[in-house]
Amino acid sequence: IAISPENLKISERAVICMPYHKLLDCYEEDRLADAKYGSTRRGIAPVYGDKYMKKALRMGDLFHPETTKARLADIVAYKNLTIEGVYGRPPVSADDMWAWLVEYGDILKPYICDAGLYLDKAAKAGKNILFEAQLGALRDIDFGIYPYTSSSNVIGAYAPVGAGIPNHKIDRNIGIMKAYSSCVGEGPFTCELFGEEAEKLRAAGGEYGADRKSV
C-alpha cells in the first residue's frame, strides 16, 4: 500500500518528539543505572512531560515558522539547564534543532490535518472507525503498575479524548485477553514465569519487544 496524505493523517495537535527528548531519556536511564524504568530510550517520557509543562511543540506549529522558531529557542535554552546542570552533558544547539524540525516538518506537512474534524466527517458519512490501543492496561499511566508504565493512557476510555470526538460515538469496546501475561521493561510482573517454561512460551508466541527485541 502506497503511503500518501490520502490514507495517512497526522493530528495537528500531535506533540513532536525532538532529538533532545531522546537524549534526555537516555541520560536519565543511565543516571538511574540499576534502578532504571526500562525505557525504550525513544524520548517518550520526556516529550509527554514537556507536553504537560507546556514546553512542547505540536505538528500544527509547523505552519507558523516565525513564532515556532522563537519558541523553540526558548525551549532549548530551558532544556539545556537540565542537560548541562543535571547530567553534565554538552548543550543542544537551537539552530541544529530548528534545522531538524524544518527538514522533517516539510516532509510531514502534507499529512497534517484537524483529526477531530476528519473523523467527525467520516462518522457522519457512515464509515466505520477503529481505534487501536497500544500496550496492555497495566502499562496505562493512571491504571498501570506506576511508575513502571508508559507515559500515556492506553485504555479504551481515552480513545475519544485522543481522537477529538464525543465519547458517545464509541458504540463498541473490544477487550483482548492473552492466555498468559507478558510485558517489557522493568518493575514487578505479576504471575511471571521463569526458566524453560517461559522460554518455550516466548519462542512460540514471538514475545519480544517490537522496539528493541527485548524479552
Locate predicted features.
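Non-transmembrane, aqueous-exposed alpha-helical and coiled segments at domain scale
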Residues: 1-214
